[in-house]
A protein has these predicted regions:
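Primary detection of the long, small/polar-rich alpha-helical "axial" segments characteristic
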Residues: 1-282
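Hydrophobic topology marker
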Residues: 285-287
């Protein structure tokens, strides 16, 4: 017979304490929706989950970077499109001026519009900007942060070398579309430049404009290819993000069916332990 210790009551108390802890843990998981709320719940699982969360955040930013790249290219392509329309009008004027039916006075009128259109091309090349960066002026070889064609970071991780190449980045370049770059020259006090004041000049202007149109078309083609690639990159990033989030959820999120069963079990055992503790205490008092 034990006098100072009631072993049965101590066992009931210990069991009740354990079940209460399990009950609180299950309640926390059910209320937060997470299986891992702290490192003690699953140290290894928490580490993997945090790495996956970091990956998801990186993919979110990569998707934003790619979208920014598309926005930039669309601005540049829009400006190039307007330049193309201007060049087509300039070509019409040059062909008109090459006709012998025009007088020198009429050629002067057509040349006035011709020069104004060239000035507009020059203005567009200087004024086309994205986030404060001038895209088409030819003063910088890039529109980003590198000293060459810009590098868009479209991956979740740091840039890594793979067989002499790179991953997670995309190199994008926008060439200069200034008048000089496309082979045209404004008329000044000391330089006749590209003009259509005479029939011979008009013929020369047609050749120069054809070359300029080809330059603009090539640039627009490149920009279209870049945009298509970035759109595919965004789709791929979205797919990666979905699968990574799913993997992280499988590790960190609670299984409500399983945890509800555990909660109910702990609740029953906790109540049973309290009942047993009361029964043992009553027996001890009745002796």
């Amino acid at each position: 017979m034990r006098i100072n210790h009631n072993i049965a009551a101590m066992v009931a108390q210990g069991s009740g304490r354990i079940q209460n802890q399990n009950l609180q843990s299950s309640l926390e998981k059910l209320s937060t929706g997470l299986r891992i709320n702290r490192a003690s719940d699953d140290a290894a699982g928490l580490s993997v989950s945090e790495q996956l969360r970091s990956q998801v955040r990186g993919l979110n930013q990569a998707q934003s970077n790619a979208s920014d790249g598309i926005a930039l290219l669309q601005i540049a392509e829009g400006a190039a499109n307007e330049m193309s329309a201007i060049l087509q009008r300039m070509r019409e004027l040059a062909i008109q001026s090459s006709n012998d039916t025009l007088t020198s006075t009429e050629r002067t009128y057509t040349n006035t519009e011709f020069q104004a259109l060239m000035q507009e091309i020059s203005r567009i090349s200087q004024a086309t900007q994205y986030n404060g960066m001038t895209l088409l002026d030819g003063e910088s070889s890039s529109f980003g942060v590198s000293s060459g064609p810009s590098v868009l970071h479209i991956g979740a991780n740091n840039n890594n070398n793979v067989a002499g190449g790179t991953i997670d980045t995309m190199t994008v370049g926008v060439d200069s579309l200034t008048l000089g770059a496309i082979g045209l020259t404004l008329t000044t006090a000391t330089d006749n430049g590209t003009n259509i004041t005479g029939q011979a000049n008009a013929f020369n202007a047609i050749d120069s404009i054809d070359s300029a149109i080809n330059s603009v078309n090539n640039m627009r083609s490149d920009m279209g290819a870049y945009v298509n690639r970035l759109e595919h990159a965004i789709n791929n990033i979205a797919n990666q993000k979905f699968n990574t989030q799913d993997a992280e959820a499988r590790i960190r999120d609670v299984d409500f069916a399983t945890e509800t069963t555990t909660f109910t079990k702990s609740q029953i055992l906790s109540q049973s332990a309290r009942s047993e503790e009361r029964r043992v205490g009553k027996e001890c008092r009745s002796r």
